[in-house]
Amino acid sequence: MGKEEEAAIKLSPKLLELLRKLGEIELRDVDIEVGDLEIWLQPGAPLVASPKVAAVAAAAPPKKPTKILEAEFTPLTQKYPGRVVEVTLGATKGKGGSRGKTVVIGGATSPAFYLFEEAPPHPPVVALDVFDTEVPLPKAIKTYIQEVMEDPAAWAKLAVEKFGADIVTVHLLSTDPLIQDASPAKAAKTIEEVLQAVDVPIIVGGCGDPKKDASVFKKVAEVAEGERVLLSSVTLDMAEAGLLDGVAKAAKDHGHVVLAFTALDLNRAKELNRRLYEFLPKDRIVMDLTTAALGYGLEYSFTIHERARMAALMGDPELQHPVLSGTTNAWAAREAWMKMGPEWEPRELRGPVWETVTALALLLAGVDLFMMMHPVAVRTVKEVIGQLMSKGGTKPEKIADWVTAKM
């Protein structure tokens, strides 16, 4: 076979393929010398011309926004199923006591100062500490009370008339077996003198010894019958020693309120409350969940108080009690009073600031009653409470106004 024939054989399939794809063949510069030209097309798929694609115009770029989109905002407000019980401290003559006024704490139905949900029914209050025996106090405090430190009644009167105490706390430290081991009768006599000196409600503080406190509280409850004093405090240690029942019965029989103290443990707080329910109605119980000072565990105190209040609002009946803070514990922090470097000065203000910050932190966690010491700290905390309470109920859509608020 010649080269020309071989080339023709190789070309034939290519021609057929082009004819199948394009439907036509255009030959240029080709000379064909034939007698007869025969083309055979084998049966197959019909020849279809490729579709023509229409030209697509390029999309115009999106326009830049000229204003912020408007959207409706519905502020979230919440109703809580629980409510903190109200507790009345002190009793007027019409109620069997001799106080010139009473103090009501508790009653919250929303978290502390959620004014856009509901304003607190009663403002938090401040009690000033008084001691029945000489105790070591920082100079910053002694400056204000030096003349009355040996007279609890005069000290209480100064706290009310000069420093604006809503309540007076009388700490009966002289009853401590390791200090003076004063008798319950002598302690009760001190309480009588304080009740005659002032007309505000009274908190009676023990020495911390369960056995001695139990005997003192029973005697004080009898002597101060009808005055609705707050006995501070009853503990699970008393229960374990078999002393709690006697104190609770004395409080019930003589018309007083008890302070249930536990150390940063809600389960133990609930257990103590359950034991007290056997003798006392809920409106005769206040809780002390422990106050740790700024720099010494304040964040733990804040958390436990906040958890207790939210549990109460969400319906836990065993935590629906007003809460007391022993804010004077701030002075246990050595930074509040000891001599330090110049960056810590002025020393006379450091302690009051320490006590104030401790109180304000727990105020926002829901504390209803503060035990305090320094007059400047007391005044500052009362002013803050007054400002917050004066706002009343606010509209939910204005909850961010604090960003531009001026004090």
PLM regions: where:
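Short, acidic/polar
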Residues: 148-160, 216-217, 353-360
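Glycine-rich, aromatic-flanked loop segments that form ligand/cofactor-binding clefts
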Residues: 91-133
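Active-site mouth loops of central-metabolism enzymes
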Residues: 12-37, 42-44, 125-154, 179-182, ...
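Glycine-rich, proline-tolerant flexible connector loops at the mouths of alpha/beta enzymes
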Residues: 136-141, 164-194, 198, 204-210, ...
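Acidic (Asp/Glu)-rich catalytic clusters
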Residues: 160-164, 192-197, 218-225, 245-254, ...
